[in-house]
Curated annotation (Swiss-Prot):
GO terms for molecular function: protein sequestering activity. Keywords: Host cytoplasm, Host nucleus, Host-virus interaction, Inhibition of host NF-kappa-B by virus. Belongs to the poxviridae A49 protein family. GO terms for biological process: symbiont-mediated suppression of host NF-kappaB cascade. It is found in: Host cytoplasm; Host nucleus. This is Protein A49R. The keyword Aminoacyl-tRNA synthetase does not apply. It comes from Vaccinia virus (strain Western Reserve). The keyword tRNA-binding does not apply.
Amino acid sequence: MDEAYYSGNLESVLGYVSDMHTELASISQLVIAKIETIDNDILNKDIVNFIMCRSNLDNPFISFLDTVYTIIDQENYQTELINSLDDNEIIDCIVNKFMSFYKDNLENIVDAIITLKYIMNNPDFKTTYAEVLGSRIADIDIKQVIRENILQLSNDIRERYL
């Protein structure tokens, strides 16, 4: 799919957009259906593992994050932005993104998770911040925010990126 997106072939691009649109809608419905059955500790652990590039795609919310990450990654803006920052700016970014976890806004939470995933692609930051990241996220309960906002966020992502 990624090659089709970059090839410039209109038919391939339209197929990619349609596939991602369908996948995002489908996974959003699965998240709504399954979110109550997922233990909060497991959800938080899976979020940390997603950020650290070890995804449990059996967790529907992690599958949702993976799909959003794939869609947004096509834009490459995030990678360019992260790569342009020095270490102090990245640390500031990490601190600012953590604040998003304490707000009842799923878009900000998903943005924070995906940005942290980009940052943790750097082995130096992964080594330094993995433990702190895990302990901070372990204290957060975002299931209610997910339940209430997943459909709207899914629609917003489709409108913005697809």
